[in-house]
Swiss-Prot record:
Coiled coil: none annotated. One of its GO terms (cellular component) is cytoplasm. This is Protein GrpE. Residues 200-218 have a biased composition (Low complexity). Keywords: Chaperone, Cytoplasm, Stress response. Residues 1-44, 198-218 are annotated as: Disordered. NCBIfam families: PRK14143.1. The gene is grpE. Belongs to the GrpE family. One of its GO terms (molecular function) is protein homodimerization activity. Residues 1-10 have a biased composition (Polar residues).
Amino acid sequence: MSGEASTPAQDPSVEPLDAAPVAAEPEVMSTETPAEGSLTDPAERLQQLEHELQTLKQEHETLQSQYMRIAADFDNFRKRQSRDQEDIRQQLVCSTLSEILPVVDNFERARQQLNPESEEAQALHRSYQGLYKQLVDVLKQQGVARMEVVGQLFDPTLHEAVLREESTEQPEDVVIEELQRGYHLNGKVLRHALVKVSMGPGPSADAEGAASAEAEDS
């Protein structure tokens, strides 16, 4: 019937009396915190930053010191390795050259003792002398130099005294004869020279000299 009143179910704008109330949405609290500087006194913040800066400076100095130590250790290691390699090289060179020197001695003895007379012997002698000269030139190129010892004061760092004898020509402790040639290698002793050393004129010569002086005075 058109005259009937509308019921709540028929009118959507009217809420039913038994309807459950709608819960209100909870208020969301902000999780954002204010900036740290807004809660800290500027003087305290400055002090904190200065402390952090000082700590960083100390750490930097420590790392710098460690770096310098490591760099110095590495440099010393490199120099030590270089010296060791040079020492090994010098030892090998000295060992090799020391084995060659007796060959040079034999050439020099042959040169002094042999006196070839025939043309064939002279040709052979010249051939040997050519080899000797080449050998000496090679030694010079390697830094080997002969010692000059006769007339020099005896020096145990350079000479090895094999004989001692009286001499009226040279004073005591002066080298009067070279028995085996000595050599230097780049300024260092490669082989000591074997020498004969003067003992001076001796007591008999001194007595004769004193007697002669007395005779002249009388």
